[in-house]
A protein has these predicted regions:
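Tandem CBS (Cystathionine beta-synthase) repeat/Bateman regulatory domains
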Residues: 1-125
Length: 125
């Protein structure tokens, strides 16, 4: 059974970095980072602490469907919070079960309060 730590090492070998955003930044900025980095979600950090996750799904469901603008809306208004996190010692299978049971597609990995990485439901393999 592969651990989260092993998966994060593998992702690092393939230069898969974790990109983040702050809660006060505008949704448009988050969308630009996601598009530029070709990722579907960003952990939201405030003073180095994960306070949420913003995803393309959050954008579609909480902004577009309500006719709101990404220019004037802060990330904090649509991010998923409170956030469920896991640590690097957990198995990937356990984390996939957490995502499935919680209807999540992304799961931040936190160790001693520090963000180590972001798991995706696509990491299942």
């Amino acid at each position: 059974m592969k651990s989260v730590a092993e998966l994060l090492k593998l992702k690092a070998k393939h230069n898969q970095q974790v990109h983040t955003i702050a809660p006060h930044q505008m949704v448009l900025e988050a969308l630009m980072v996601m598009a530029e980095k070709n990722v579907g979600a960003l952990p939201v950090l405030e003073n180095g602490v994960v306070v949420g996750v913003i995803s393309e799904r959050d954008y579609a469901r909480k902004l577009v469907l309500h006719g709101r603008s990404s220019v004037g809306t802060p990330v904090s208004a649509i991010m998923s919070s409170p956030v469920i996190t896991v640590d690097s010692h957990q198995s990937v299978d356990t984390c996939m079960n957490i995502m499935t049971d919680s209807h999540l597609r992304h799961l931040p990995v936190v160790e001693n309060g520090q963000l180590l990485g972001l798991l995706s439901i696509g990491d299942r393999s």
